[in-house]
Structures are given as structure tokens and as C-alpha cells.
UniProtKB/Swiss-Prot annotation:
Keyword Lipid metabolism among record annotations: no
InterPro entries: Alpha/beta_knot_MTases (IPR029028), RlmH-like (IPR003742), tRNA_m1G_MTases_N (IPR029026)
Protein family (similarity comment): Belongs to the RNA methyltransferase RlmH family.
Native species: Aromatoleum aromaticum (strain DSM 19018 / LMG 30748 / EbN1)
Protein's name in the database: Ribosomal RNA large subunit methyltransferase H
Function statement: Specifically methylates the pseudouridine at position 1915 (m3Psi1915) in 23S rRNA.
EC number, UniProt record: 2.1.1.177
Subunit and partners: Homodimer.
Length: 156
């Protein structure tokens, strides 16, 4: 099984790449964490938000593996604790299917793409900068794995 993050937006600041890379490197070989960036639709006048999200959804769909469990990051998704995420990760591993976590652009994800999700999660009830999602999600997944393996990274 592998974990894939498909995120809208390219050219993130160096700290985003460094943060994501640090936790992706820590993941074990049997559970690799990869990132695929898709181009955000340019925010220009004359385009509706719906049209921009639809264009981004097309790019996201093209980046998704043929068979995977789709997990949408959404402000209305399930709010999980670290222990609950660890249990979810364990269930995903037991299912054996690759898991793709989908991060939308500045306006979110299109309703049509959201409808294809197997699950919806949210990282926080706080409003966070868009760029922070990648390293935060990578750290949360690494922490969940460390809980399952009784690794000393996570402490109760």
C-alpha cells in the first residue's frame, strides 16, 4: 500500500517542501508517502469559482491512480484525533488498497469531485494557510504510523 497526496498548487515556499520532505522520508518503505502537485486554475476575471474548481477537478482526476481509496480533505470532513487517524491508517492498510488524499485549491474542491470520495477528513477547525496543509498532513500520517508501531515519536 502507498499513500499519495494530490494537491492543487505548484511552486510552494521552500519551508513547505522541506516540511513535507522530512516526514515523507521518515515513512517506512512498506508505506511510502508521495506528493503529486496539479496546476491551479489561474484566478482571472470572467471565470466563475465553479468553472475554476471544475478545471482543477479535471487535473486532479488525471493525476489519480486508476484504483485507489479517495480521501478528500474538506472543512466539513470527519475531525479525527491522532489515535483515530492511526486506527484509520491501520484499516486502510488492512484493506490493501492505495490511498489518495486530495487537497483542493484556494476555493476548495468541486462538488462533483467531492461526490466521488470514499471519505472526507478535515485537519483542523482552525483556518490555516493553504501551504501548511502538505507538511501538516505528512506529519499527521507519520505520527499515526508511529502510534501503530509503538515508535517513540508520539507520546500520550
Amino acid at each position: 500500500m502507498k499513500l499519495l497526496i494530490v494537491a492543487v498548487g505548484t511552486r510552494m515556499p521552500a519551508w513547505v517542501e522541506a516540511g513535507f520532505g522530512e516526514f515523507a522520508r521518515r515513512m517506512p518503505r512498506e508505506l511510502p508517502l508521495q506528493l503529486v502537485e496539479v496546476k491551479a486554475e489561474p484566478r482571472t476575471t470572467g471565470k466563475t469559482v465553479e468553472a475554476m474548481m471544475a478545471a482543477e477537478a479535471t487535473r486532479i482526476e488525471a493525476a489519480l491512480p486508476a484504483r485507489c481509496r479517495r480521501v478528500i480533505l474538506d472543512e466539513h470532513g470527519a475531525d479525527l484525533t491522532t489515535m483515530a487517524l492511526a486506527r484509520r491508517l491501520e484499516a486502510w492498510q488492512a484493506g490493501g488498497e492505495d490511498v489518495t488524499l486530495i487537497v483542493g485549491g484556494p476555493d476548495g474542491l468541486s462538488p462533483a469531485l467531492k461526490a466521488t470520495a470514499h471519505e472526507r477528513l478535515r485537519l483542523s477547525s482552525l483556518t490555516l494557510p493553504h501551504a501548511l496543509v502538505r507538511p501538516l498532513l505528512a506529519e499527521a500520517l507519520y505520527r499515526a504510523w508511529s502510534v501503530l508501531k509503538n515508535h517513540p515519536y508520539h507520546r500520550e
